[in-house]
A protein has these predicted regions:
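Periplasmic binding protein-like
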Residues: 30, 99, 239, 369-421, ...
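N-terminal lobe/hinge region of extracytoplasmic solute-binding protein
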Residues: 31-81, 112, 183-184, 480
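Gly/Pro-rich hinge or "lid" segments in bacterial periplasmic/extracellular proteins
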Residues: 68, 158-212, 216, 226, ...
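Surface-exposed binding/hinge segments that line
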Residues: 78, 89, 125-169
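Structural transition elements
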Residues: 188, 307-340, 357-362
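Ligand-site clamp/hinge motif
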Residues: 204-250
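Extracytoplasmic/peripheral linker and loop segments enriched in polar/acidic and small residues
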Residues: 283, 377-388, 415-483, 504
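Long beta-strand-rich cores associated with HINT superfamily self-processing modules
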Residues: 337, 479-504
Length: 504
């Protein structure tokens, strides 16, 4: 399903749920599978943060549910001096939730912080390293001075690390306090955070845009998809962002509920630890990939709510190469390749995965079964999600394989590939490949989108040839909904914006 088709069908589906009378307000309750643990925009990389961040923060640029870039805290922008400078005209008379003014100094503070020592502590800085500095022209005008081309910069300014933060508040309270008590310019104001339980917001009646219609917005952190489904059926949720695939048809039969499944940007793979044991051998890595029937996994476990991938990106990603095909499922050839490489039957490897993800647990079990059939014994190692993402992977403490899952929120392979394959990036604890580094630099340093797409496709082919990962699938974005919630904007990237939502 193409993105435009998804938007049209989603609009029709949601419109059919909407009442024709005066819309109510009330409280919208949303389940998220993960608590990011910190609400500071520069401290995160998680889709679950993006699902919340757009309620409390704004960027200079915003992205609509149909992925169009529109003015946010900036009313307009233009490239100057042969694309070496990006000038923003800022929206006047905007205030942060604590009352301090939004102006050019706030923009400069935000990016000085992101690009400075504070930004080094989090995963966002590398997304914005094309920016040399931000210069205040006047209170409503700023210039971004660029040290290199960045053809994805405008998109990246519409999310995550580029969200504008309040200088005075952070200077007075400190970054740690800010991370637990966020203040922005967004449509909802933070009221309470209970770690691993919930985060709550109230309506920002003074919002510079259309004021939200809801009185309250509550996110509950529910890691188990089955629990999300149970809470949805019990009427204690309005939106569930993860439900067991096996329960989709059951939920659809409930007259109070609906389920929407659309193409999404989330890609899943098993990344290989190329410095450990048998994984040092590229032919072994290829053999293991060929030993797993991904089509069968998609059909029997994911019930068709995913598509096979040949590289770590979905079909909606700029840079995806339709001509690149996954290695075929061929267990006999895989077994022969392992034997030729000297891998002894019964060789043991470890697969690390996100323990609370019951859907992927089944996938991991299936992978273990396929590898067992070619003589490789897999030990499944579940981790608390934040432990795996914040400690085990970035510190190079993984087993031979680990669950690699990426939201791909820019819908551009650049963001994914740089984070995954460039030397010493957070998600690349093991590999140091000069050719990959050069290709990644090349595509980031041109405004020529045709040339850039060609380079990105070359990167995906090279990664496949080196067998750095076992590409699995691109997962559909699936929402379970209570029909009492109306006018929901449900983008495929999971970054909610509930300005128009109401609850009967």
């Amino acid at each position: 399903m193409k993105l435009k088709t998804f938007l049209a069908s989603t609009t029709l589906a949601l419109a059919s749920l909407a009442s024709t009378g005066t819309q109510a307000a009330g409280t919208l309750t949303v389940a998220l599978h993960q608590d990011p643990g910190n609400w500071d925009p520069i401290a995160t990389f998680l889709v679950s943060w993006g699902a919340v961040g757009g309620q409390v923060f704004d960027g200079l640029i915003m992205r609509t549910p149909d992925m169009k870039l529109v003015p946010g805290l900036a009313t307009k922008w233009e490239f100057l001096d042969k694309n070496s400078k990006l000038r923003f005209t800022l929206r006047p008379n905007v205030k942060f939730h604590n009352g301090e003014p939004f102006d050019a100094e706030a923009v400069k503070f935000t990016f000085d912080r992101l690009l400075g020592e504070e930004g080094k502590k989090g995963p966002q800085q590398s997304n914005y390293n094309s920016i040399e500095k931000v210069v205040v022209v006047n209170p409503t005008t700023v210039d971004f001075v660029l040290k290199s081309p960045d053809p994805v910069l405008l998109t990246k300014l519409a999310g995550y690390g580029a969200m504008i933060v309040p200088p005075k508040y952070i200077k007075e309270k400190g970054s740690q306090f800010f991370g637990m008590n966020p203040v922005g310019t967004g449509p909802f104001k933070f009221t309470e955070y209970k770690p691993k339980v919930s985060v709550s917001f109230e309506r920002n009646a003074a919002y510079w845009g259309d004021a939200p219609k809801l009185d309250q917005l509550v996110y509950r952190f529910i890691s188990e998809p089955a629990t999300q489904a149970a809470e949805l059926r019990a009427g204690r949720l309005d939106v569930a962002n993860q439900i067991p695939l096996a329960m989709i048809e059951t939920l659809k039969k409930d007259s109070k509920l609906s389920v929407i499944s659309v193409d999404g940007p989330v890609a899943l793979a098993l990344r290989y630890n190329t410095q450990r044991g048998i994984m040092k051998d590229r032919e072994v890595r290829k053999a293991l990939t060929m030993a797993v029937d991904r089509d069968a996994i998609i059909k029997t476990i994911l019930l068709g709510h995913a598509k096979p991938i040949a590289s770590f990106q979905g079909a909606l990603s700029f840079g995806n190469d339709p001509a690149l095909k996954p290695l075929p499922y061929n267990p006999a050839q895989a077994k022969a390749m392992l034997q030729k490489a000297g891998v002894k039957p019964g060789t043991q490897i470890q697969l690390d995965f996100r323990g609370p993800d019951s859907n992927f647990r089944e996938v991991a079990q299936a992978v273990a079964g396929y590898l067992q059939a070619v003589g490789v014994t897999v030990s499944l190692k579940p981790y608390e999600t934040n432990v795996l993402l914040n400690d085990i992977i970035p510190n190079g403490k993984t087993g031979e394989m680990w669950q690699n899952q990426w939201g791909g929120w820019t819908f551009d392979y650049d963001n994914t590939a740089y984070a995954m394959y460039y030397t010493k990036q957070r998600w690349n604890p093991f590999d140091d490949d000069a050719k990959l580094n050069a290709l990644l630099h090349m595509q980031r340093n041109t405004w020529d989108q045709v040339a850039r797409k060609s380079t990105l496709q070359e990167i995906s082919r090279y990664v496949a040839d080196q067998a750095l990962e076992m590409p699995l699938y691109s997962l559909n974005t699936i929402y379970g909904l209570n029909k009492r919630a109306k006018n929901l904007a449900l983008p495929s990237d999971g970054r909610f914006r509930f300005v128009d939502a109401t609850v009967d």
